[in-house]
C-alpha cells in the first residue's frame, strides 16, 4: 500500500503554520459580516437565475437597496419580472427577424402577424420589455400597433413605470410607447358591439382608462421622484418624451431639430409605418386641458428642490442637460415668452440679468457655456427660444464683436449658427463682414456649415452675397474644374495601384465621408443663390470633362450637386442646353448605376424647354431597352421617362415631354412662346394707351 506523501523538517512545519494563518485571515471578514441579513431561499434562487441568465440585466442588486441613500431617489428595489425560457426566446427572436425583413404581401398580413405575436406575449410583456434580446421586438411591435393594442399594453405597464423607466432596456420600450400613444390622447373609448364581440373571442377585457388617463397615471407613479429621474441615465430620455407629450409638442425622433433624442439616436421599431402615422407624430397635437396644469406642476416639481447653483450645474451635466433643454424650450415656447419675466422661472434662474454686463452673473454663465461641448447645446436652445429683447442684449454684449472667432471654434460655431438665424438684415450684414475673413480657415478645416448657413440667411434677409462669393472664390483653386473637386473632396483620377493604396489607407474613414457630405451640401446651397455665388458652381460644372462628370454622377454624395444644378430655378436655359448634352452617349451607363440613375431622372425636368435634346435621349434609352428592364434602377428610369408611352404613342409622349398634358388636365398653364409674350406685351401697351385717351380728351 503506497504511503501518504509528507514533507519532513522544520521548514515544512513553519510553512504549514503560515498557510493556516492565511486561511484564518481570509475567513475573518466573513465572520465579521454576520450582522448582514441572510437572504432567504427564494431570494438566493432568484439571484442564481439572474447571474446565470444573460437575458436580464438589473440596475442594482436587490440586497443593497437599503444601503444606498440618495436625495429624492426611490427605494432601490428593482423588481425581477422573470426570464423567458429557451422556447419563448427562440420564438420572439424569429418574430423579430420576420419584422426586420418586412416581406409581408400587404398591411393586412402584417397586422395578423403582429396580433399573433401579441397573443404569444400575453402575460409576458414585462419579461419581454426587460429582455436584452427581445426588447427591440417590443419596440417594433409598439410602432406597428393600432391604438387598441397600445391601450392594452399601456394598461399592463401601469404600476411598473417607476421601475421600467430606469431599466436599461425597458426604458426604450416606454419611450416608444409614449411616442406612439401620443396621437390618441384625445380619442374617447369606443364601446361598439364589434369591439365587444372581439373582446369576448380573445377573453381579454378592454381597459377602462383612456390614454389620457393612463398618462396621468404615469405622472402619479413618478411623482416625488422627478429630481432623481432628471439625471438618471436611462430614465432621462423617457422623461423628455413624457414632457413633450403632455405639452402636445411633436415627438418625432427623426427630426434634426428634435430636442428629445441625442444626435446619435438609433431609430428602432419604425418599420415601414404609414405616412399619416408619421405625420401624426411629427405635428403638434391638441391635448386635454388637464395636461397643461399637470405639465406646469411637473416642471415646477423638477426644479423647485434645486438651488440656482445646482440648476446651472445641470447645464454641463451630460444626462441632465437634455432634460433642461426641454424644460427651457417648453417654458419659453409653450407658456409664452412672458414667463421669462417671472423671477422663479427656469430661464430667469439661469440668466437673472438683462444687461449682460462685464462682471454680471449671466455673462459669466453664458461665456462658460460657449465652449463647453455639453453646455453649448443648452445655449443653442436658449438663443432659439428666448425673447427678442433678451436676445438683442445677449448678442450685443457677448457675441457680436467675437462672432468671427466664435465661428472658428468647433463647439461655439453651432451657437453662431443659431445666432445667425435670428439676426435682422443690418446685423446680418455686419456679422457677414466679420465672418468673411475667417472663411479661408473654415474651408481649410472643413467647417463648411458656417458659410452654408450664412448663404441661407442672406437669401432670406435679402443681403448682398457678392462679398461672400469673392471670399469663397479666393478660398478655392482658381481653376473652375479643380474648384469643384476640392469642394466635394474628390481626388483627380489616378492609376489603379494608387487608388487601391488610398482605399487601404482611408478605408471606413467616417471623417472623410462627413467632410464630403458637408462639401456637397455647401455646393447645393450655393446653387440656390442667384448671382455670383451660384455662378461659381455652374462654371465649375461646365469646365468638367466627360470622365469627371461620369465620376461625379456615380458618386452617391456628389451626384446630388448635379441633380440640384439640373432642377434648381437658378439654372438658365443656356446652361442647361450646354450641360445636358454632355451626358449623351452615357445615359444607359448612368441609368444602370444606383446614383447615376437619379441624375438621368433629373434630366427629364431639366430638358422641359429643350424637346430636341429630350427626344434624342429617349432614343438612346430605347436602344438598350432589354438592359434597362433587367436592372432594378434601370426599370425606374424607364418608368420615369415614360418609355412605354414613347414606344407606342409617340405623339402623347411628345405632349407630356413638353408639359402639355398637365395643361389639359388642369394641372398647370401652358408655357408661352416668345411670340405669345410679344403679343401680350403689345396688347397691354394698347390697353394702357386707350385708357389714357379719354383722360386727355376731358382735359
Swiss-Prot record:
Gene Ontology MF term list: RNA binding
Main localization category: nucleus
Compositionally biased residues, Basic residues: 1-10
Keyword field contains rRNA processing: yes
A GO CC term attached to the entry: nucleolus
Keyword terms of this UniProt record: Nucleus, Repeat, Ribosome biogenesis, rRNA processing
Pumilio repeats: 120-155, 156-191, 361-396, 397-433, 540-580, 582-619
Name of the protein in its database record: Nucleolar protein 9
Source organism: Neosartorya fischeri (strain ATCC 1020 / DSM 3700 / CBS 544.65 / FGSC A1164 / JCM 1740 / NRRL 181 / WB 181) (Aspergillus fischerianus)
